[in-house]
Amino acid sequence: MIMYIIWALLFIPVSAQQWTLFDEQAKPKREGRVRLVGGLPSSGRVEVYHDGQWGTVCDDGWDLAEAQVVCRQLGFPGAVSVASGGQYGEGSGPIWLDDMNCKGSESILSECCFKGWGVNDCTHQEDAGVVCDTGTNATNIRQISVDNSLGLSDDLGLLFDSEDGCDFIIAVQDLGEEAELTLCVHRVILMMYPELNITNDTRNLTVDVSQTCQSHVSALIRYLYTRQIDVSATSAQCLYQLAFIFGVQRLMEDVGRVFTALIPEDNTFQTPVSMYEYGLRTGDLVLQENVLQYLSWNCEFLISSPVWSTVSFEMMDALLQRSDLIVKDEAVLLEALERWIQDKGDQISSDKQASLLSHIRFLLIPVDKLYDIQFSSSALYQNNEKLYLTGLLRGFEFNALPFSKIRNQIDNASSEYLPRIYTGDEWSVFINDTTVSSPYYNYNYYGQSNRIQTFFTSAHPSALYKDQKVQWQAQVFLTLQECSNYGVSCNTLPVARFYGYSNQYSYSNIISYNNRLILTCKNQNNVFHVQEFKNDVAVIPTNSSMGLPNPCPDDYSFRFVVRPQYI
């Protein structure tokens, strides 16, 4: 009788709205899932699912280790080879991942190291692909996965909220004081996290959490059930700290990546400085790098903020070693360091002062400011006069002698003659107009668009090249018609172009130009993106291509920076 009922049910007609196993739109999609597009089932362009949308992977740093992770995630034994340069066609939508660094042992691609979702300087012409190994013993038996796990997270969240059947107490207290918060949870959930050392005999757990973060403990414990959590600029610090306390490494990494997208929301710099210190304590290198990059880009604003005097020695040491640090010139950076030393007083030992001073690139200080340094009355100068004089001597040599003369005296691994991103008027031009209007209205008296600027720089910072000029033109295109007018192929908009005229190539044997585009919010004065030019062109990221919450959509300015260096 039971078999008859089941057999009869198979023939019950269904409505036109039924879901079938082969309905691609109705299949549940999971965060971090990957697929291959544009080729065979075992080869194609790699696409990854994030934030409700499929996107591609840039081929920068794309190697066999990354391909192995993708292929194993898809159920193949491994990878045969990688494909780059959009070999399987160009994708659409966001470019989610760039500069991937996989060990090869990760279970899914999103577990690999990367700077952040959507953080890239790529176009879809650089979409990565793979060729997977189908296995020598593969059979023709087809298996179709039935996945009903989509609602599991919500169900477990309801279980936490209801406390039904809870059998374990978490007591939260402020640094040894009496418990101020208790949560009743389920031991079996906590036992899934071996870092907590919960056994069948454990009945409770007491944790010390500062009062400022106690309100976030419940959200953290709920994450242990659901693997879902909302992160904001105000909660990121506490959630990161709590993830460290509870040993949830994956959440720490995820919060660090999310925080990268939220950094621009804090114009005071207090939150990123604090997050860097957390990154130091926990050994989170990705978080440290993301914070340092943002602070380097915004160094001009950071050194004039009250937070500058609170920066730790470790952060200062790391900042001064970076070449992506944006500042008017090297002399301004030295003055900021001297002011920081003055504010710190006796907290910074003479050895540490000397270490920081060694990161100043005296060779690149403008020669007139180099001359003035010898008359400095700063505490740093008084305590390290010999180091200053050595730096001044090397700086004057660099400005007076041809590079061929001093090349053998400079360590190839040294960064002392490599430029940072100097934004002084002699090395950069600023374009503030982002309006698209009448083709006649938006042009100046010379018939040139306000988004096209021509200017001159010296061929090199050395005084030897002071009177040898290179002419540059900076352009910002907001429409396809503008691109077409200047013979530029624009796959997306906006696009920036920056190129030197013919006299640039007169120095090609001794000088190279690694120019940069800086995007700055008009009203907030914070840099949120820095990009290299590839073949004189930079595709300016938008919300969809960055995958980040742009702090000033369609309301930012462009600074084009010339960066000459000896070859």
From Swiss-Prot:
Keywords: Cell adhesion, Disulfide bond, Extracellular matrix, Glycoprotein, Secreted, Signal. It is found in: Secreted; Secreted, Extracellular space, Extracellular matrix. Coiled coil: none annotated. InterPro entries: BACK, BTB-POZ/Galectin-3-binding, BTB/POZ_dom, SKP1/BTB/POZ_sf, SRCR, SRCR-like_dom_sf. Disulfide bonds join 58-122, 71-132, 102-112. Gene3D superfamilies: 1.25.40.420, Potassium Channel Kv1.1, Chain A, SRCR-like domain. One of its GO terms (biological process) is cell adhesion. One of its GO terms (cellular component) is membrane. Residues 272-374 form the BACK domain. Glycans are attached at residues 137, 197, 200, 204, 412, 432, 543. Residues 1-16 form the signal peptide. PROSITE patterns: SRCR_1, SRCR_2. Residues 34-133 form the SRCR domain. PANTHER family: GALECTIN-3-BINDING PROTEIN, HL07962P-RELATED. Promotes integrin-mediated cell adhesion. This is Galectin-3-binding protein A. It comes from Danio rerio (Zebrafish). The lineage of its organism: Eukaryota, Metazoa, Chordata, Craniata, Vertebrata.
